[in-house]
A protein has these predicted regions:
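Charged, alpha-helix-forming regions
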Residues: 1-218
Length: 218
C-alpha cells in the first residue's frame, strides 16, 4: 500500500470535498498591467503573457510565488488542459494570463498541478480562444487535507525533476516520462478512483521505478 493511499484512507474516509477555484486561492487579475512591446524598457524581470515569459523588463508588479493560467490566445493544450506556468520572484504579468496566489488550507503547488489536470475545452470561447474570469473562478477543485496535498506535490515534483534531467539526455525517454507523469498526475488527482485502482497505481509506480534502475546513463 502506497503512502498516498494510506493518507487518503486515513484523512478522507468519506471522500474529498470540491470547492470553486475562487475559494481556494487569491485571484490577482485586477493587479495585472499590459505594456505594449514598444513601451517596454528592457531589464531583468520576466514579463509574462498567456503562455509564459514574453520578454524581460525593467520593473515588476508582483513579488512572490504565483501560478499563471493562460486567459486568451494560446491557452489550451491539444489534450484540452489549460496552459499553466509556475512563477517565482519579481515578475510582471500582462492581461493575457490569470494570476493566483496561495491562501491557508490549499497549497499553491497543489493547485499548479491540479489545474493542469482539468479539461477546460468546454470553457474556451470566442474566435480568439479565451478562458474568461467567470469560468476560471468556477473551476471545481478537489481539496483533500494538507497532508494529502503535500504527498501529491512530492510525487509530482519528483517526476517533474526527472523530466527536467532527461530533457538534456534522451528525447525518447523524456516522451515516455512525460506520458508516465501525465498518467500518474491524472490518477493521483482523480478522487473518484477506488482503493483497488490506487493499489494498481502503486504497483505500476514500483515497476517503473525498478525498470529505471536498468537504464544505462553512460
Amino acid at each position: 500500500m502506497s503512502n498516498l493511499e494510506k493518507l487518503i484512507r486515513e484523512k478522507c474516509p468519506n471522500g474529498v470535498k470540491f470547492r470553486k477555484l475562487s475559494e481556494c486561492c487569491n485571484i490577482l487579475d485586477n493587479k495585472r498591467k499590459p505594456v505594449t512591446k514598444s513601451a517596454r524598457e528592457k531589464g531583468e524581470y520576466p514579463y509574462y503573457g498567456a503562455n509564459g515569459i514574453q520578454d524581460y523588463v525593467s520593473d515588476y508588479i508582483f513579488d512572490g510565488c504565483f501560478v499563471l493560467v493562460g486567459e486568451d490566445g494560446s491557452v489550451i493544450t491539444p489534450s484540452g488542459n489549460p496552459v499553466v506556468n509556475w512563477a517565482e520572484g519579481k515578475i510582471w504579468v500582462n492581461n493575457h494570463a490569470h494570476i493566483i496566489e496561495e491562501i491557508d488550507g490549499v497549497l499553491l503547488r497543489y493547485l499548479y498541478y491540479y489545474i493542469q489536470s482539468v479539461n477546460v475545452r468546454e470553457l474556451i470561447h470566442g474566435n480568439i480562444p479565451k478562458l474568461n474570469q467567470g469560468d476560471f473562478k468556477n473551476i471545481r477543485v478537489a481539496v483533500p487535507p494538507l497532508e494529502v496535498q503535500q504527498e501529491i506535490v512530492r510525487v509530482l515534483d519528483n517526476f517533474s525533476f526527472l523530466s527536467a534531467e532527461l530533457s538534456a539526455e534522451l528525447s525518447a525517454e523524456l516522451k515516455a516520462r512525460q506520458q508516465q507523469y501525465e498518467y500518474y498526475r491524472n490518477k493521483l488527482l482523480n478522487f473518484n478512483e477506488s482503493p483497488e485502482s490506487l493499489d494498481t497505481l502503486h504497483t505500476h509506480t514500483h515497476t517503473h521505478t525498478h525498470t529505471d534502475t536498468l537504464v544505462d546513463k553512460k
